[in-house]
Amino acid sequence: MKVLDELRDLVEDAIKGSTVFEKSKVLTPDYIPKNLPHREKQIKELSINFREILSNPGSTSVRVVISGKTGTGKTVTTKKFGELFSEIAKEKGLRVVYTHINCHRQRTLYLMLVEIANQLNLQIPNRGLSSQETFKLIYDYLEKRNIQLIITLDEFDYFVSTSPVEDIYFLVRIYDELNALVKRIHYIFILRELTSLASLDKSIKDHVIKNVIEFPPYTSEELYDILMDRIVNEKAFREGAVLEETVRFISDIYGIDKGGSGNARLALETLELAGKIADTEGSLLVTIDHAKKANSKINPELSIILDTIRDLDLHQLLVVKAIMNLHKKEGDDFFSMGKVEEEYNIVAKDLGEIPRKHTQVFEYIRKLKLMGLITARQSGKGMRGRTTLISLSVPISEELDNLINNEIRDRLLQQKNY
């Protein structure tokens, strides 16, 4: 009992303890800030390309390509543009809806269309519709409500590399399929390299590469402005908690002109982690030393995976946690569906959650596989019958374990608050 009391005291002290943060959420990848330092030019270019939707709606289908490396502000800029453009359209009495689709998460044409429908609050029948039928439902929905739809296809290069040519053709040349006089569907294609489109047929490529907007990597000075905007204007930290030299240090690590990657996402992630390290050490200031420790822990290759994990709902996270638990207990990499479900039930009950039924757990695993978080293979010799074996597709580490635990805790807190 004494040990339990000591642990409880430890947890309570940590909860009550001081923190350098004020609004840490403004440092997360999903946050859309009020300002976008050093992306004003790109916002203007997007606005010029799409202004005909407002001046002459339905006359043309706009297509824009955005190209730039990871962390150069492509996603946040397009989302901010979509938010502002829709507001301005509304003020002019026009209905413009902006949808943002991540092709790495919605990995097939059908899944992408279902997600577009979800963002439109359009119910898709459960019966097995084809992609073409689903798109027709979406278009009819737009037609009835006189809506202009901007579809951003983020990580479009992934879709190009993994999808059948006919799916790509259908998507980008939709008006060859639809007998529609009024053009209601417009595209923003986001990719890392324009060269990823080199393999496309010329007839498709000509439809995609209409207007190209480049997003160059950030310089040290630009990263400094971005970090300071989150610290000062967005109030990520308590006033005076982050030393100016710390911000300079992080900016110099990642600035393209200083030999870094120019990746703002990693710069923000490093700043957030430095703040957490300061909290752990009981420091009221975020110092260069904290930034150095944070930098040593940041793994650029995990950045995309971490984004995917942060998008999971509670019970999807519990399935991932179950696989990690089995790995720790048994030392194996692959586990049967039955074992994973059994461990998931234990994890859920331990947290006071009602485990989902078998069909729902199977659906979670199917979605996790589509997202690239787990892999599945058929059992070989030595097992009775054909059994599906499941494994995490990412390396299991202490950092990953901490992330999963933190995300589970956050989902439980959100449920409690609602």
Swiss-Prot record:
InterPro entries: AAA_22, Cdc6_C, Cdc6_lid, ORC1/CDC6, Orc1/Cdc6_arc, P-loop_NTPase, WH-like_DNA-bd_sf, WH_DNA-bd_sf. Signal peptide: none annotated. The keyword Cell division does not apply. One of its GO terms (biological process) is DNA replication. Gene3D superfamilies: 1.10.8.60, P-loop containing nucleotide triphosphate hydrolases, Winged helix-like DNA-binding domain superfamily/Winged helix DNA-binding domain. ATP binds at T72, G73, K74, T75, V76, Y218, R230. GO terms for molecular function: ATP binding; ATP hydrolysis activity. PANTHER family: CELL DIVISION CONTROL PROTEIN 6-RELATED (PTHR10763), ORC1-TYPE DNA REPLICATION PROTEIN 2 (PTHR10763:SF31). Belongs to the CDC6/cdc18 family. This is ORC1-type DNA replication protein 2. It comes from Sulfurisphaera tokodaii (strain DSM 16993 / JCM 10545 / NBRC 100140 / 7) (Sulfolobus tokodaii). The gene is cdc6-2.
